[in-house]
Amino acid sequence: MAAGMVATMVLLTCLAAGGLVVGAEEDGGGGGLGRLGSPDYGDALAKAILFFEGQRSGRLPANQRATWRGDSALTDGREENVNLTGGYYDAGDNVKFGYPMAFTVTLLGWSAVEYGAAVAAAGELGNLRAAIRWGADFLLRAHASPTTLYTQVGDGNADHQCWERPEDMDTPRTLYKITADSPGSEAAAEASAALAAAYVALKDDGDTAFSSRLLAASRSLFDFANNYRGSFQSSCPFYCSYSGFQDELLWASAWLFKATRDAKYLDFLTNNQGSSNPVNEFSWDNKYAGAQMLAAQEYLGGRTQLARYKDNLDSFVCALMPNSGNVQIRTTPGGLLFTRDSVNLQYTTTATLVLSIYSKVLKSSGSRGVRCSAATFSPNQISSFATSQVDYILGKNPLGMSYMVGFSTKFPRRIHHRGSSIPSIKVLSRKVTCKEGFSSWLPTSDPNPNIHVGAIVGGPDGNDQFSDNRGDSSHSEPATYINAAFVGACAAAMGQKQVVKLEEPADNLESMVSTY
């Protein structure tokens, strides 16, 4: 290869550490491309965390920064004499779905556990911990007895027929739950994983009583999921599981072993690894890749009985890395991992988080990398590819579009989000009715009056095209689990100093260099 081409490749793949940290601003100011064309990761991280304050349900605290929001859903749970206030609205509607909410908390906890130092350096660890606790508090309340977990608050069908602010909503706050007689092992195990991850992330926060509650509830939920096995598919109206519950049981046991070092959870992982399978996505439904990542971390730490998980995780990497010879998930012409058209960035951000963590673990263990059929990828190459996904989301793409609201100057202005698209209750104090929202606020081409800073939308299509259309929920709607995975991925990019070694296979390097 010519020396000039090598130098160009080094320049393109060396990412800046993020520059000055810029605090998240409510109006979306600041941010953009810094030196060498790298995004300001510190600003993006701050805004990704701020997003969760705009998704809060319940009575808002005095230090609420998304000031366009107000209190909402203050009587949730009353019909069954249980307090189910708080938690997060999952996306652009006003329903609280416990299953993806728990996954959101798990991902936020994982981000804090793996990248707490980088988040702290950005001045955002307190805000991240607050986001974790807001969701974990709800999950604790939802676990009303050893064999009860409330999994949804609100009637999804009725809610989706209205377009109104959460502060105004008058649709039924119907309660859904799993019990010993109507189990949902996926939901119970995911809640267990969430509380275990929250415990690991928050145990040094000074509130020992709260930490003890997290761990006790996590253990209880795992027992509920494991002892009363049944699929959530038969007891859910929305966010039903299609991958079964074995992945969540592995995921929860891996988190509980990380949290407690209790041998019974390691034994569960060891004895059930036959149910671990190679996958090409990581999502609110399919947790295999996450469980494999946690177990592979233990394998590389000396627990060689967990070898199958490491092998499966290597297959996951090979399914994603361009030119691996085993690619299952294609990249768009602009370089974005593209799993499916609807809400694709949820899969991109979760995959990027796993790739980022795995590259770090491989490097710390002294591993040379992952061998695929056509190439071997070093930890640096894996992390470079992961960073390219973060950069794409933040604007290094064919459209020059940041898919994070409020980051840089070109970002989605008409996101599919009820609260963002109707003037704040603090500005328009009268009630906006269900039908008025549909006729007056959903169809307008005007930008949303409330900039939902940090919200990451579903993203572009397979040809890198994006229509900023409020009615297009598949591409314009944000979701908590998109942002939750991005927090860790962005922190990884921020703390990383890329050094491309010239002895690495040139064709592998070229496949990961973005020209945008």
From Swiss-Prot:
Molecular function terms, GO-annotated: cellulase activity
Protein location: Secreted
InterPro entries, sorted: 6-hairpin_glycosidase_sf (IPR008928), 6hp_glycosidase-like_sf (IPR012341), Glyco_hydro_9 (IPR001701), Glyco_hydro_9_His_AS (IPR018221)
Pfam families: Glyco_hydro_9
Protein name (database record): Endoglucanase 20
KW Cell membrane (keyword) present: no
Residues bearing carbohydrate: 83
BP-aspect Gene Ontology terms: cell wall organization; cellulose catabolic process
Gene (name only): GLU15
Active site: 93 (nucleophile), 416, 468, 477
